[in-house]
């Protein structure tokens, strides 16, 4: 039993609507921006935003700002997560299968857009990094926390591979993963002759065996 639990009445009221049930169903699976939700459900932005506001207001959704975008998802802990977990068997049937198919298409487009973006900026990566990080040296930060010897190290989202040689100083084997072919080509050239392998993949589906 949850201690000091507040009344669940606002939660039940919020879910007494088909659109909000559909929103919770898809956002329990994936964190999405407003634009992505609009594209997946085929509804107007004002309508979606109103329902999102109600769900965030009662705590059944959380929002996270990233630049110009706001992303929504269900809570990762606490009473609200426990409540939605108890309803999970019914939430699974709270919307058409087409919603999940549309969300999968939206996520594919997100990955493709990310890949196009990083392919485009790959040649100018060093300049962009200096503009963002200034004199900060990520390699020195890695050296400060990395053990003296490790069997395997991985850089997920390795970009052009600037940290891969640093990892190879102390790791017997190093793997760099990125979704951009242009970035991986730069990483491969940078690490020629080192015990480093580069692989194309998404963070959600890493090209690495468990364990």
Where are these regions (language model features)?
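Class I SAM-dependent methyltransferase SAM/SAH-binding core
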Residues: 154, 159-205
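Amphipathic alpha-helical dimerization/coiled-coil segments
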Residues: 78-124
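Short, hydrophobic-biased segments on the C-terminal half of alpha helices
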Residues: 52-53
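Beta-hairpin "wing" of winged helix-turn-helix
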Residues: 57-66, 73
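Class I SAM-dependent methyltransferase Rossmann-like catalytic core
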Residues: 122-132
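N-terminal helix-turn-helix DNA-binding core of bacterial DNA-binding proteins
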Residues: 2-47, 68-78, 141
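Conserved alpha-helix/loop element of class I SAM-dependent methyltransferases that forms part
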Residues: 132-151
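Alpha-helical residues within the helix-turn-helix
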Residues: 39, 56-57
């Amino acid at each position: 039993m949850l201690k000091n639990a507040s009344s669940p009445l606002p939660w039940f009221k919020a879910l007494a609507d088909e659109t909000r049930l559909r929103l919770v169903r898809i956002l329990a699976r994936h964190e999405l921006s407003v634009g992505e939700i609009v594209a997946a459900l085929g509804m107007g932005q004002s309508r979606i935003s109103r329902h999102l506001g109600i769900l965030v207001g009662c705590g059944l959704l959380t929002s996270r700002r990233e630049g110009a975008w706001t992303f929504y998802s269900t809570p990762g802990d606490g009473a609200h997560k426990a409540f939605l977990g108890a309803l999970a068997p019914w939430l699974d049937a709270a919307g058409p299968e087409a919603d999940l198919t549309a969300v999968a298409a939206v996520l594919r487009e997100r990955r493709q857009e990310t890949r196009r973006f990083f392919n485009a900026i790959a040649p100018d990566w060093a300049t962009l990094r200096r503009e963002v990080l200034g004199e900060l040296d990520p390699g020195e930060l890695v050296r400060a926390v990395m053990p003296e010897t490790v069997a395997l190290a991985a850089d997920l989202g390795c970009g052009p591979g600037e940290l891969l040689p640093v990892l190879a100083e102390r790791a017997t084997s190093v793997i760099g993963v990125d979704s951009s072919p242009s970035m991986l080509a730069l990483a491969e050239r940078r690490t020629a002759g080192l015990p480093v392998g580069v692989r194309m993949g998404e963070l959600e589906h890493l090209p690495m065996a468990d364990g």
